[in-house]
């Protein structure tokens, strides 16, 4: 199967998981990215069963609304039973690198209030040690040089994210992203705390303190489920 076929497989598995485990009238938490988009598409026929969804990005909001979902403000929602999102990398403890799509801060916020985080990914995303995928760090624009120096002191090689048009990439929150390569992340929780403590950092794309609870992994043999 192609990578796109594996993504579609896990997206449908996530839809099946939600339908089996989330009560009618609940609010869904929805992530960002290509696999999350396929999950949104798979849930579209069942939208009437749910009160609505909380989205982690403007892009996902547009896709949800295009399918007729009510997209709710997180401030108006008391509980989110399940948050479904992809990952750029995930290890065997459920710790993840996320943020390749630029929505790491909102993803982390929605994940933090969800009862359960269901990660959907193809088999290429499962790794022994995090860090081959450059680690995204969202930064207040005025602090980007100062933060970059501190990330370099931690052993990383930070690079300012740019658009295809050669402009500085801007998040939905109006910030910039430093993508940090060269890190071999043996202790994700420790590094997450270290980077979050740097003044000017909004958040880091390490999801270790609040990692995945369930992984639905698309493989040639089908969807594998892992619980953490």
Swiss-Prot record:
E.C. code: 5.3.1.6
InterPro entries linked: NagB/RpiA_transferase-like, Ribose5P_isomerase_typA_subgr, Ribose5P_isomerase_type_A
Biological process terms in GO annotation: D-ribose metabolic process; pentose-phosphate shunt, non-oxidative branch
Signal peptide positions on this chain: none
GO molecular function: ribose-5-phosphate isomerase activity
Entry GO CC: cytosol
Keywords assigned: Isomerase
Keyword ATP-binding: no
Pathway participation: Carbohydrate degradation; pentose phosphate pathway; D-ribose 5-phosphate from D-ribulose 5-phosphate (non-oxidative stage): step 1/1
Disulfide bridge partners, by residue number: none
Residues involved in substrate binding: 32-35, 85-88, 98-101, 125
Any coiled-coil regions, as ranges: none
Residue numbers annotated as active site: 107 (proton acceptor)
Catalyzed reaction equations: aldehydo-D-ribose 5-phosphate = D-ribulose 5-phosphate
Keyword Isomerase: yes
Pfam families in the record: Rib_5-P_isom_A
Family listed: Belongs to the ribose 5-phosphate isomerase family.
Quaternary context: Homodimer.
Role according to the record: Catalyzes the reversible conversion of ribose-5-phosphate to ribulose 5-phosphate.
UniProt-listed HAMAP family: Rib_5P_isom_A
Record-linked NCBIfam families: PRK00702.1, rpiA
Protein name stated in the entry: Ribose-5-phosphate isomerase A
This protein's encoding gene: rpiA
